[in-house]
Amino acid sequence: MSEKTKPVVLNPAKQLMDAGKLSLMFSVRQTRSVDIALAAKAAGYDSIYIDLEHGALTIPEAGQICVTALAVGLSPFVRVPAGATDAAGQVLDLGAMGIIAPHISGPADAKRMVSACKYPPIGTRSNSSSLPQQWIAKMPLVDVQKRLNEETMVLAMIESRDGLENVEAIAAVPGVDVLLVGTSDLSAELGIPGQFGSDIIMKALDRIIAAAKKHGKHVSLGGGIKGGSVNVLKTLCDKGIRQISVGNDVGMLNAAMRQRVIEINKLIA
């Protein structure tokens, strides 16, 4: 492939994880302005994910943020509602470099999402010309699809008892790149909501990490455990966690607002 035809967009988060380094991801739930991608880049994140499962953004709004993320060198991921393969295809065509697929309970769920996200021969993703990932340039279709199959990631969320029980089979699905642990939902399903440092959660994480290593996949950590102790996070990274979802726009704005009020009240007390 010549430099003229080579798609220029890479996936920074994937590059970090493939190199054994840690990827830091920021969640966007409410912010509609593309400035959020600029802010995440300036703060030092390498990736963002736009949340269409729990957030208020539309698909066109998600696409605009994805394009801005591409332009500044962030990996844009989008979490679609459970089983929403059509939405996955749309946001990929609008610039996403990966799909976060929630509530993956078994290999059949994972295969359906992979099929929607990957071009043949891996999947059945429909072709759309002039994609943002290729800077809307005219390039040979075979080159574009090959490169996007390499760079586009499918992050299968393990956040239920069924998902945990079937994690080995999910990890074995070709085209699944990452097992993303939804610790908030998983802890609730296991009867210990919010107890992110418990032995039960740690054992579940050990099982997920082992399944990922066996099948050459990465593990990403979402949910409340990101707010846990430094020692817990250090231990998990040493075990093989390669990505952490570190905060969302609503939570960080709220925390900063509360802190500012505390500071001002101290000054005028």
Give the ranges of each region predicted by the language model:
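N-terminal amphipathic alpha-helix/helix-capping segment at the start of soluble metabolic enzymes
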Residues: 1-27, 138-150, 207-210, 214
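Active-site mouth loops of central-metabolism enzymes
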Residues: 17-34, 77-81, 152-165, 218-228
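C-terminal helical cap(s) of enzyme catalytic domains, especially alpha/beta-barrels
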Residues: 65, 107-123, 250-269
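Short, well-ordered coil/turn segments that N-cap beta-strands
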Residues: 19-24, 45-46, 70-76, 96-97, ...
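N-terminal active-site wall of soluble small-molecule enzyme domains
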Residues: 56-72, 78-94, 142, 146, ...
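Catalytic cores of alpha/beta
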Residues: 38, 78, 83-97, 101, ...
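Conserved anion-binding
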Residues: 86, 98-174, 185-188
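Glycine-rich, proline-tolerant flexible connector loops at the mouths of alpha/beta enzymes
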Residues: 36-37, 42-64, 181-199
